[in-house]
């Protein structure tokens, strides 16, 4: 069945929390303090209400999620463009490229073609053993670092989406 992409709604919160906590278990084991890794239902609801939280469904079940924090929102990214965060894939789906498909859909359909943004940003932890390299393989480049007081250095990354702006 073809995956379905849509904005999350409040009734998705419990399913998103369960998926997020399972997906971020390795992050917790590494001691990295990403907000999503320690989410509760209130934080999931806040994310849905304040940001553009997207889900990917298969057979009516949420299998992945990704969120955009907008420059005009309460927690903007560093560059005045939408900022990716809270990216999680159901670990039970196996290595099927689901995260890649969701990220590509977000970059192309939402960011490039709908919002017409020239680039997008994200942040990850310098201590994470493979996320920086994964994003570099997907076309992201390092663009800065900042100590946000979370016990790691946040590495900011950008990806150019449009060259005509």
Curated annotation (Swiss-Prot):
EC code(s) of this entry:
2.3.1.-
PROSITE patterns membership: GNAT (PS51186)
Gene Ontology molecular function: any one: acyltransferase activity, transferring groups other than amino-acyl groups
Under the heading Pfam families, the entry gives: Acetyltransf_1
Phenotype upon knockout? Cells lacking this gene almost lose the ability to grow on 2SC as the sulfur source but are still able to grow on sulfate. Moreover, in contrast to wild type, they highly accumulate 2SC when grown on fumarate as the sulfur source. Addition of 2SC causes growth inhibition of the deletion mutant but not the wild type grown on sulfate as the sulfur source.
**GO biological process: what's one of them?**
cysteine biosynthetic process
Query: N-acetyltransferase domain spans which residues?
Result: 3-162
Pathways per UniProt: Amino-acid biosynthesis; L-cysteine biosynthesis
Q: Which UniProt keywords apply?
A: Acyltransferase, Amino-acid biosynthesis, Cysteine biosynthesis, Transferase
Catalytic reaction list:
S-(2-succino)-L-cysteine + acetyl-CoA = N-acetyl-S-(2-succino)-L-cysteine + CoA + H(+)
Which superkingdom?
Answer: Bacteria
Q: Supply any other comment.
A: Fumarate mediated succination of thiols increases in certain tumors and in response to glucotoxicity associated with diabetes. Therefore, S-(2-succino)-adducts such as S-(2-succino)cysteine (2SC) are considered oncometabolites and biomarkers for human disease. The demonstration of a metabolic disposal route for a S-(2-succino)-compound paves the way toward the identification of corresponding pathways in other species.
Q: What does this protein do?
A: Catalyzes the N-acetylation of S-(2-succino)cysteine. Is involved in a S-(2-succino)cysteine (2SC) degradation pathway that allows B.subtilis to grow on 2SC as a sole sulfur source, via its metabolization to cysteine. Moreover, 2SC is a toxic compound in B.subtilis at high exogenous concentrations, and this enzyme relieves 2SC toxicity via N-acetylation.
The family annotation for this protein states: Belongs to the acetyltransferase family.
Query: What is the designated name of this protein?
Result: S-(2-succino)cysteine N-acetyltransferase
Native species: Bacillus subtilis (strain 168)
Q: Which gene encodes it?
A: scmL
């Amino acid at each position: 069945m073809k995956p379905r992409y849509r904005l999350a709604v409040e009734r998705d919160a419990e399913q998103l929390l369960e998926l997020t906590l399972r997906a971020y278990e390795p992050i917790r084991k590494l001691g990295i303090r990403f907000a999503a890794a320690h989410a509760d239902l209130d934080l999931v609801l806040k994310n849905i209400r304040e940001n553009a939280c997207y889900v990917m469904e298969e057979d009516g079940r949420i299998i992945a999620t990704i969120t955009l924090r907008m420059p005009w929102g309460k927690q903007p990214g560093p560059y005045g463009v939408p900022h990716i965060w809270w990216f999680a894939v159901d670990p039970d789906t196996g290595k099927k490229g689901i995260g890649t498909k969701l990220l590509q859909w977000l970059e192309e359909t939402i960011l490039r073609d709908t919002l017409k943004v020239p680039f997008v940003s994200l942040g990850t932890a310098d201590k994470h053993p493979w996320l920086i390299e994964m994003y570099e393989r997907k076309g992201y480049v390092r663009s800065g670092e900042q100590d946000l007081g979370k016990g790691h250095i946040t590495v900011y990354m950008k990806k150019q989406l449009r060259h005509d702006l």
